[in-house]
UniProtKB/Swiss-Prot annotation:
Organism field: Arabidopsis thaliana (Mouse-ear cress)
Protein name as catalogued: Protein LURP-one-related 3
Organism phylogeny: Eukaryota, Viridiplantae, Streptophyta, Embryophyta, Tracheophyta
Similarity annotation: Belongs to the LOR family.
Domain of life: Eukaryota
Record field: transmembrane: none
Entries under InterPro entries matching the protein: LOR (IPR007612), LOR_sf (IPR038595), Tubby-like_C (IPR025659)
Amino acid sequence: MQIYNPISPVKTMVKIYPHLAFPVDMDVVQDKILPYLTTEQERFTIWMKSLVFNSKGCTVFDSKGNLIYRVDNYDSKSWSNEVYFMDLNGKILFTLRQKKLGFFKSWEGYNSTGTRFRLRKIFKILPRESSSSYKVVMGSRIVDGDQQSCYKIVNRGSVFAIKDGSGRLMAEVKNKLSDISGLDLGDDVLTMMVEPQLDHSLIMGIVIAYKLTKCKL
């Protein structure tokens, strides 16, 4: 069994959180990761790298720089059709599986209660190069065969937003800027804003599934 052994890439993390030392205090983080419901607008940093040596994945920090989520793929050569989205202690929050529906591919998120969501690209007859859309169908509708979108992801350049069925913004993800210089930290460092009264573990699971459709993990 692979043992989780976080590696401290100090130079990179200093650029992301210049005011923090690394590694973080895990006992402090453990007390703060639950519940997952946002009480106010919250920001998270998504680092598209794994802390496990020679692995692919991503690492998610809260606004204080505490590690809260991670994805680690121990096969460094390629992704399998099944990916695990975990909390900092390695507890699996969502199992993400790639599905093929005829000519179309989708990613589905499962947890202990069953299928939670399915994400698939919306294909347009006259697509615009500057944008693309994905629909997210939640668990109960997947079981009933209802393909009506519960959420929608709209991608414009380096920014993408998650909206509910009425068009209300739920979350937005974009490249993060340095707190010191204001410079773009690159495609590997993202900032995610999540609106109040939302399950940010579910939002993050959807973001991971979206990144998998674009082979960005």
